[in-house]
Amino acid sequence: MSNFWKDKVVWITGASSGIGEALVKQLAEKGARIILSSRNADKLAELKAKLPNTEEHSILPLDVSNENIINQALISRKELINSVDVLINNAGISQRALTWEASRESERLIMETNFFGATALTKAVLPGMMKRNAGSIISLSSPAGAFGFPLRSSYSASKHAIHGYFDSLRAELDAAKKNIHIMLVLPGRVSTNMSYNALKQDGSKQAEADQRLASGLSPDECAKGIIKAAEKRKAEIYFGREQILIYIKRYLPGLFRSIVTKFKPD
């Protein structure tokens, strides 16, 4: 087994379920020391108790949509955060609402969670990484970060923002000759509860699963791909059949518009 992850401090948001939970389990098995973050402290404690070398892992309950909570965590756990070798921005929230019906509150919550939360944590870990001249920042995006899709205007905007931010950060770090790896992950359909928690026009949860996700990748498969790509220091990786739409939009924009216009939501 590779020693790549041995004793690395890996901070994972959205760690209590889905891809985040799968990453926690697999990286703990590889010898990483995990900082588990999500809003569900009880679930985090339950997960941590099942990990190998459980005493080496830490729990940091966090609502990434709340700047005050983030700032309190950064102050109270400053030493721990300064030690982070790998940050995985996995926490996120999706959307199922027509643009003209979506409330401003729901749009702001999506941006706070998916963009401002991720960038706040990124800026928190960067000083330690830059001082050591080593580190990795991995952010979960979506094919919606490469093209717009019906019922996901604010979600897509948040993911486009993630791409612009981290592409710019990568260029800045490269220009400064810093050995800090930036990777964007664009998974297509993954069998998680993300659609269940997606926001409707009034900001309430959809509270039902999209049937298409049932045939998607498992979180375990997705986590394995992310880990492998991180070890190879990839800049951007794709999973699932949806990646074909990225190329269609780039080279056949008329066909792409025809495809998304005919899209029927679950």
Give, region by region, the residue ranges found by the protein language model:
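Conserved glycine-rich cofactor-binding loop
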Residues: V9, S16-S17
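Conserved glycine-rich Rossmann-like NAD(P)H-binding loop of the short-chain dehydrogenase/reductase
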Residues: K30-L47
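The beta1-alpha1 cofactor-binding region of Rossmann-like NAD(H)/NADP(H)-dependent oxidoreductases
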Residues: L62-Q72, R104
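Substrate-binding pocket helix/loop in short-chain dehydrogenase/reductase
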Residues: L98-T99, S103-R108
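Active-site helix of classical SDR
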Residues: T122, S158
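Residue(s) in the substrate-gating loop at a strand-loop-helix junction
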Residues: S142
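SDR active-site lid
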Residues: D174-G240
